C-alpha cells in the first residue's frame, strides 16, 4: 500500500521516495488532513465576509462624504510634503546665515549716518563743471532775490511777534547765502582774470607765477575794496572788520588777577 501510494500519490510528485521513509514513522491521517482543509476554508470564508461587509458599508456612505474624505487626505499629504521641504529650507538658510555672520568683518562697529546724495551731484557721475551748473541753475538766484523782497514786504505789515521773528531769521539766512554766493563769484572772476594774464606773460617768454592762498585772499580783498570805493558800504565794511579784530585782540590780552578783597567778598 505504501509503495503504491508513494508511486501514484502526491509524495512521489513531491520527490519523497520509499528509502527516505522509515518503517516506524506514520504519515498524516485523512482526518487530520480534512481538518486542515476545513480550517483554511473557514479562514477564506471569514476574509470574504469581512470584505463583503466593508463593501456594503462603503456603499451605504454617500458619495459627497467620500469625496470630501479623499480631498482631506490629499491636503494632509501635501502639507506633510511642504513641511518637509520647509524644514530642509530653514536648515539651509540657517547655515548660510551663520556663515555670513562669521565672515562679516567689523560686525559690532558703529557706522556713521549715511546721507543720501542726488545722483547728478555724486562724484561717480563725473567731474563737476561749475559753468554748466550756473547756466542750468541760474534761475535759483533770481528766485532767492524775489523771495527776499517778499519777506521784507511781509515784515513791514506783520503784527504777530512770533511770525515777525521767524521772518527775520529766514531773511538773515537768505542774505548770508546771497553774500556767500557773491563772494564765490568774485573769487572765481578774480582768479580767472589773473590766470589769463599769466598765460599771456608765459607766451611772452616769462616764467609762470603761482599765487599762494594768502596772496589770493589779498587779491580778492583788493578787488572788493575797489568795487566799494566812493560808497558808504566801504566805510561800513571797514568798521565791521575793525570790530572783529578788536574782539580777537581782547581774547588774547592777559587778564588781571583778582585782588584779595574781591576773593574775600
From Swiss-Prot:
Signal peptide: none annotated. The keyword Nucleus applies. It is found in: Nucleus, Nucleolus. Residues 239-255 have a biased composition (Basic residues). One of its GO terms (biological process) is maturation of SSU-rRNA from tricistronic rRNA transcript (SSU-rRNA, 5.8S rRNA, LSU-rRNA). Residues 1-59, 231-265 are annotated as: Disordered. Residues 17-48 have a biased composition (Acidic residues). The keyword rRNA-binding does not apply. Keywords: Coiled coil, Nucleus, Ribonucleoprotein, Ribosome biogenesis, rRNA processing. Pfam families: RRP36. Residues 146-204 form a coiled coil. One of its GO terms (cellular component) is 90S preribosome. Residues 1-11 have a biased composition (Polar residues). Component of the 90S pre-ribosome involved in the maturation of rRNAs. Required for early cleavages of the pre-RNAs in the 40S ribosomal subunit maturation pathway. Belongs to the RRP36 family. Associates with 90S and pre-40S pre-ribosomal particles. This is rRNA biogenesis protein rrp36.
Amino acid at each position: 500500500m505504501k509503495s503504491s501510494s508513494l508511486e501514484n500519490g502526491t509524495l512521489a510528485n513531491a520527490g519523497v521516495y520509499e528509502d527516505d521513509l522509515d518503517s516506524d514513522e506514520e504519515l498524516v491521517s485523512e482526518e487530520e488532513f480534512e481538518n486542515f482543509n476545513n480550517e483554511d476554508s473557514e479562514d477564506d470564508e471569514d476574509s470574504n465576509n469581512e470584505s463583503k461587509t466593508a463593501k456594503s458599508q462603503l456603499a451605504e456612505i454617500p458619495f459627497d462624504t467620500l469625496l470630501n474624505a479623499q480631498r482631506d487626505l490629499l491636503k494632509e499629504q501635501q502639507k506633510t510634503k511642504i513641511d518637509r521641504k520647509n524644514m530642509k529650507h530653514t536648515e539651509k538658510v540657517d547655515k548660510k546665515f551663520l556663515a555670513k555672520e562669521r565672515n562679516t568683518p567689523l560686525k559690532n562697529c558703529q557706522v556713521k549716518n549715511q546721507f543720501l546724495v542726488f545722483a547728478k551731484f555724486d562724484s561717480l557721475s563725473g567731474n563737476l563743471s561749475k559753468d554748466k551748473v550756473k547756466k542750468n541753475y541760474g534761475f535759483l538766484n533770481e528766485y532767492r532775490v524775489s523771495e527776499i523782497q517778499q519777506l521784507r514786504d511781509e515784515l513791514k505789515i506783520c503784527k504777530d511777534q512770533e511770525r515777525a521773528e521767524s521772518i527775520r531769521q529766514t531773511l538773515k539766512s537768505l542774505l548770508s547765502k546771497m553774500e556767500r554766493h557773491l563772494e564765490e563769484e568774485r573769487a572765481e572772476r578774480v582768479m580767472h582774470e589773473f590766470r589769463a594774464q599769466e598765460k599771456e606773460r608765459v607766451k611772452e617768454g616769462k616764467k609762470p607765477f603761482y599765487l599762494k592762498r594768502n596772496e589770493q585772499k589779498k587779491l580778492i580783498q583788493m578787488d572788493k575794496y575797489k568795487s566799494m570805493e566812493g560808497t558808504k558800504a566801504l566805510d561800513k565794511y571797514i568798521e565791521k572788520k575793525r570790530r572783529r579784530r578788536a574782539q580777537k585782540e581782547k581774547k588774547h590780552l592777559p587778564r588781571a588777577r583778582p585782588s584779595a578783597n574781591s576773593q574775600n567778598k
